[in-house]
């Protein structure tokens, strides 16, 4: 049985940060960086992010969508979890169904990554790697998109996509979009914003390029978008002895109209933090003084936000809820998440969770619309038994990740009072 939620990688970004930059004027970029749209009806200014890479899938904070391996066949089963009660059920309306194999209404012909993208009108867009007739010997790994309603009924059947998507997904409520990056030998990237049609009358599943950029070597998209475009960070690296240090230079907005606007400029050893989930925001941390500042994305101006211990180094994993920032640092080689409230004292989150026998801090995985957090509570280990292809009875140990829902304030206190979501093992 597979794990539902992958581990959050705590890879240290060796950043020594100082202060935030000032307002800069919009600058036009070279023609080869300009966005090119082949979809006139695409309204990119209304795009909202549906998920981040490896994210949980939920829309309004009431229902979580997830998948598990089908117990008695290949493929997967689509399940829902009520985020107010923690109860889990298969997304299947067949009377008397046992939810075991491909006869279940929740079954998907899926063998790898899947994205469940809830739309505001109640439809579910499913994007996943495929088994079966779409997979040709020696061909590029295939993917499919299909459309279902909230009962699990298929509205548009699985339709092949030209390549397998990865990373974040976006929507304008008419279509869904994702970024496709193709790296060149010189380190630059050809980045396409791919649009997937959802209207059956216009060719459900048809993929087209809504925007295209040729980004220079050291300009990296963050996957967070605003009405104007995609947030990005321009960076460079330098050597300190035998250590390569990544150093941010500019926080930028790669705009839909093909220009790149510098939001804030770094000096000396400065860098920026764009939270992975929750509110779209940008921060600047000074490692030498422990000062965290918040940036205005329109003007680039900064205001003090919080002060932390000196010498911390930012690492991956962050969430923003109103005036609360939760982010992860490395101190003396150890990962430490902190709860920061504007103008308040920082609180180190000391709750530890176990993953494959290793302890690590309880991590925030997503932010719900009502401001609650989905938190990784560690692994639930248990025995499972099954009959293999030879008819032999097999017993083995496996695990799945426990998830909890809590308010930011409950998380600050160690998430002891959080709502624990029902696991597939219990289900």
Residue ranges and their predicted role:
Residues 49-59, 100-118, 162-173, 214-227, ...:
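Repeated scaffold domains used in trafficking and secretory/extracellular systems
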Residues 70, 130-132, 182, 236-237, ...:
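Residue-level signature of beta-propeller blades and closely related beta-rich strand-turn architectures
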């Amino acid at each position: 049985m597979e794990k539902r939620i992958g581990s959050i990688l705590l890879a240290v970004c060796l950043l020594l940060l100082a202060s935030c930059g000032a307002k800069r004027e919009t600058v036009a970029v070279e023609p080869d960086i300009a966005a090119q749209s082949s979809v006139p009806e695409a309204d990119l200014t209304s795009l909202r992010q549906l998920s981040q890479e490896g994210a949980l899938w939920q829309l309004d904070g009431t229902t979580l969508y997830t998948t598990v391996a089908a117990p008695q066949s290949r493929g997967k089963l689509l399940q829902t979890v009520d985020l107010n009660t923690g109860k889990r059920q298969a997304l299947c309306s067949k009377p008397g169904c046992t939810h075991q194999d491909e006869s279940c209404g929740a079954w998907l012909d899926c063998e790898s990554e899947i994205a469940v993208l809830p739309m505001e009108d109640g439809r579910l867009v499913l994007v996943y790697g495929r088994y079966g007739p779409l997979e040709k010997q020696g061909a590029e790994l295939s993917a499919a998109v299909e459309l279902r309603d909230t009962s699990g009924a298929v509205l548009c059947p699985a339709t092949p996509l030209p390549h397998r998507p990865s990373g974040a997904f976006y929507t304008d409520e008419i279509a869904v979009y994702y970024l496709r990056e193709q790296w060149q030998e010189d380190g630059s990237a050809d980045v396409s914003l791919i649009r997937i049609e959802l209207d059956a009358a216009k060719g459900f599943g048809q993929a087209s390029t809504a925007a295209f950029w040729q980004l220079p070597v050291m300009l990296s998209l963050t996957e967070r978008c605003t009405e104007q475009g995609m947030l990005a960070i321009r960076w460079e690296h330098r050597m300190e002895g035998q250590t390569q240090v990544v150093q941010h230079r500019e926080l930028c907005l790669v705009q839909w109209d093909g220009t790149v606007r510098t939001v804030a400029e770094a000096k000396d050893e400065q860098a920026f933090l764009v939270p992975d989930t929750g509110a779209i925001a940008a921060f600047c941390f000074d490692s030498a003084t422990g000062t965290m500042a918040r940036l205005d994305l329109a003007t680039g101006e900064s205001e003090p936000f919080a002060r932390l211990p000196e010498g911390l180094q930012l690492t991956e994993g962050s969430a923003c809820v109103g005036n609360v920032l939760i982010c992860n640092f490395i101190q003396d080689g150890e990962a430490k998440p902190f709860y920061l409230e504007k103008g308040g004292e920082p609180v180190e989150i000391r709750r530890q969770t176990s993953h494959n026998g290793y302890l690590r801090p309880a991590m925030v995985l997503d932010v719900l619309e009502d401001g609650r957090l989905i938190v990784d509570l560690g692994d639930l280990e248990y025995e499972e038994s099954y009959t293999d292809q030879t008819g032999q009875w097999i017993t083995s140990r496996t695990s799945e990740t426990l998830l909890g829902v809590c308010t930011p304030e409950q998380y600050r206190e160690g998430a002891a009072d959080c709502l624990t979501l029902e696991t597939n093992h219990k289900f």
